[in-house]
């Protein structure tokens, strides 16, 4: 990796453990659906989330629409997110050798979340899909990131939780 200058990180399931937040959001969705007489289990909903993810679709919204067309917003409980144990030491080691950035499919407020975790300053820039209006794997988000980095594709590595990202 001697010619690599930049490392682009995803956020969820890469630096931040979102397991509890996702579980709670699915539980809330299932509870809502059951309350409006839609019979669905946690396992069924989770299965649809996984299918949507594999098919490059918005996992939660796609799964919810499989069971209901109600215009209901089930909030994502970000307060249950935590950094993985190795996140801080790994970033501390890498930022001395590489320029780091976050490119993630995230809602507005990603900067604030990273500041709350104490890792915002480890990154040269943070690019959320909400900033660009498209989500990974749309090439526009990657092109925007390359322009911000002033970097050729061959001088970076992406560290993501799924290969389609």
Predicted regions and their residues:
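A short, structured active-site edge motif that brings together acidic residues
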Residues: 45, 122-133
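Conserved Lys-Pro-Asp/Glu-containing loop-to-beta segment of HAD-superfamily phosphomonoesterases
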Residues: 2, 6, 135-165
């Amino acid at each position: 990796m001697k010619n690599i200058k930049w490392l682009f990180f995803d956020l969820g399931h890469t630096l931040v453990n979102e397991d509890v937040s996702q579980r709670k959001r699915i539980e809330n969705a299932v509870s809502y659906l059951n309350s409006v007489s839609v019979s669905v289990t946690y396992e069924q909903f989770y299965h649809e989330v996984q299918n949507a993810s594999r098919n490059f679709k918005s996992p939660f919204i796609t799964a919810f629409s499989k069971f209901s067309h109600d215009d209901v917003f089930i909030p994502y409980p970000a307060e249950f997110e935590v950094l993985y144990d190795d996140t801080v030491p790994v970033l501390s080691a890498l930022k001395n050798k590489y320029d780091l950035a976050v490119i993630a499919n995230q809602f507005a407020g990603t900067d604030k979340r990273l500041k709350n975790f104490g890792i915002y300053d480890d990154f040269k820039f943070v690019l959320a899909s909400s900033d660009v209006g498209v989500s990974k794997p749309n090439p526009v988000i990657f092109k925007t990131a390359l322009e911000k980095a002033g970097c050729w594709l061959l001088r970076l590595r992406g560290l993501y939780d799924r290969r389609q990202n």
